[in-house]
């Protein structure tokens, strides 16, 4: 039995995620296998609007946005694994555990996010996420998302 991996371009990502500029933080999906894992890329540009204030003279990609990029990657994996949502449904970011930041991400870096499906329990799906730059871990966390109807 062979396992089939897939890629996604930005146009396909936009069809799946509700996020838009400047908050769409996944540029391309390099590979994924449904219900297993996904590897995606965020190209970090000095033109990102938050670099004006974070930090002037020493721009650093905000850690919370690294987590958000990984959460968006989990959303893509969930959409591709479970299928399209019913009208009025969304995937919500439901929680995060064990988040650790190992080194800064700066303009010019290419951040690779790898998220791995762990389990679904009581409507929550848990994923392990790791972000790297040049093969070195910059952040890791366990994230949960839930499929729910809009309020």
From Swiss-Prot:
GO terms for molecular function: (3R)-hydroxyacyl-[acyl-carrier-protein] dehydratase activity. Pfam families: FabA. GO terms for biological process: fatty acid biosynthetic process; lipid A biosynthetic process. Keywords: Cytoplasm, Lipid A biosynthesis, Lipid biosynthesis, Lipid metabolism, Lyase. One of its GO terms (cellular component) is membrane. It is an enzyme of class 4 (lyase). Involved in unsaturated fatty acids biosynthesis. Catalyzes the dehydration of short chain beta-hydroxyacyl-ACPs and long chain saturated and unsaturated beta-hydroxyacyl-ACPs. This is 3-hydroxyacyl-[acyl-carrier-protein] dehydratase FabZ.
């Amino acid at each position: 039995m062979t396992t089939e991996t897939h890629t996604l371009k930005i146009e396909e990502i936009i069809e799946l995620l509700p996020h838009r500029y400047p908050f769409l933080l996944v540029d391309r999906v390099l590979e994924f296998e449904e219900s297993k894992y996904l590897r995606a890329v965020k190209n970090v540009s000095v033109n990102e609007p938050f670099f004006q204030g974070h930090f002037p003279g020493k721009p650093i990609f905000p850690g919370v946005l690294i987590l958000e990029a990984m959460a968006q990657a989990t959303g893509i994996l969930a959409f591709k694994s479970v299928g399209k949502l019913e009208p009025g449904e969304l995937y919500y970011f439901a929680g995060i555990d064990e988040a650790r930041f190992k080194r800064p991400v700066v303009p010019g870096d290419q951040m690779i996010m790898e998220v791995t499906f762990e389990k679904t329990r009581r409507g929550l799906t848990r994923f392990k996420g790791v972000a790297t730059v040049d093969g070195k871990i910059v952040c890791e966390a366990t994230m949960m998302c839930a499929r729910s109807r809009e309020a």
